[in-house]
Curated annotation (Swiss-Prot):
Cell compartments where the protein resides: Nucleus
Residue stretches of biased makeup (Acidic residues): 194-204
Species assigned in the record: Yarrowia lipolytica (strain CLIB 122 / E 150)
Function of the molecule: The GINS complex plays an essential role in the initiation of DNA replication. Has a role in chromosome segregation.
Protein name: DNA replication complex GINS protein PSF2
Biased composition range(s): Basic and acidic residues: 227-241
SUPFAM superfamilies to which the protein is assigned, alphabetical: GINS helical bundle-like, PriA/YqbF domain
Phylogenetic classification of the source organism: Eukaryota, Fungi, Dikarya, Ascomycota, Saccharomycotina
Main location: nucleus
Keyword presence, Cytoplasm: no
GO process terms (BP): chromosome segregation; double-strand break repair via break-induced replication; nuclear DNA replication
Protein family per UniProt: Belongs to the GINS2/PSF2 family.
Quaternary assembly: Component of the GINS complex which is a heterotetramer of SLD5, PSF1, PSF2 and PSF3.
One GO cellular component term: GINS complex
Keywords from the UniProt entry: Chromosome partition, DNA replication, Nucleus
């Protein structure tokens, strides 16, 4: 199946909501529920009006059957949302510490269980919208400091990062191209021993007086066989004359 290029780079909002449903939330069951073993987690025995933490997708299913009541997260209380909004206004270069899927969870609770909120749903919805707008404005300002290596995105939510991803990736790729185009090639400097051209010109030489070039150590050679030594002529003649005296005369060997 062919998919548009823009959908390959980012997630759809529906996909992020689907992933957010794997997070857990507290509920108050209205009926007794038997424990259930699931692939990712095990659900304990549920008692009426006793808090249990379950995946959001199960809480949605139980809520539609009127078998439970949502317990909204603490950060979704009106007082906490106002405190988060004040922090966002007072700190133009920092983000408040909220849940990674805070936008998705807020929309799920406002859509599925608005009657379980401690404040009017419209007040909570307006506060969430104001917080999102302030954080979005600050994230756009932070994109001016992006470079080809990294972009600091501490305390940003999944939906916020997903909205910035196409612009950040494209900007970093262009910066990498500019850096590669402006980078000059540095000359390679060889040392005297590392130059490969010198190795090609080197030829073996013979006849050196160095003892390392001899196949036999010089200590085992007679002094007359060393390079550069000469034997006394008179001594050589004396040895030849002694050898001639010992050689038998021509005419046949002596028995």
């Amino acid at each position: 199946m062919s998919v548009p290029a823009e959908q390959l780079e980012t997630f759809l909002p529906s996909e992020l909501h689907f992933m957010a449903e794997n997070e857990t939330i507290e509920i108050l069951p209205r009926r007794v529920g038997n424990p259930i073993k699931l692939a990712g987690t095990d659900l304990p025995l549920m008692h009426p009006l006793r808090k249990n933490r379950v995946p959001i997708w199960m809480a949605i299913a139980l809520k539609k059957q009127q078998r439970c009541q949502f317990v909204p997260p603490d950060w979704m209380e009106e007082s906490n949302l106002r405190r988060i909004l004040a922090f966002e206004h007072a700190n133009p270069t920092a983000f408040s510490n909220v849940d990674f899927h805070w936008l998705e969870i807020a929309q799920i609770v406002l859509t599925t269980a608005p009657d379980d909120l401690t404040s009017p749903p419209q007040v909570i919805r307006n506060l969430v919208r104001d917080i999102r707008e302030v954080r979005e404005q600050k994230s756009r300002q932070g994109m001016k400091e992006v470079n080809e290596n990294m972009l600091q995105m501490d305390r940003l939510g999944a939906l916020e990062i997903n909205e910035m991803r196409p612009f950040v990736v494209e900007g970093m790729e262009e910066m990498i191209k500019i850096r590669k185009a402006g980078k000059k090639e540095e000359p390679i400097i060889y040392s005297e021993s590392d130059n490969p051209e010198d190795d090609e010109d080197d030829e073996p030489t013979y006849g050196h007086d160095d003892e390392s070039s001899l196949a036999v150590p010089s200590s085992q050679l007679d002094s007359s066989l060393r390079y550069g030594d000469r034997v006394d002529t008179s001594e050589r003649r004396r040895e030849l004359s002694q050898w001639d005296d010992n050689v038998p005369q021509q005419g046949g060997p002596e028995w």
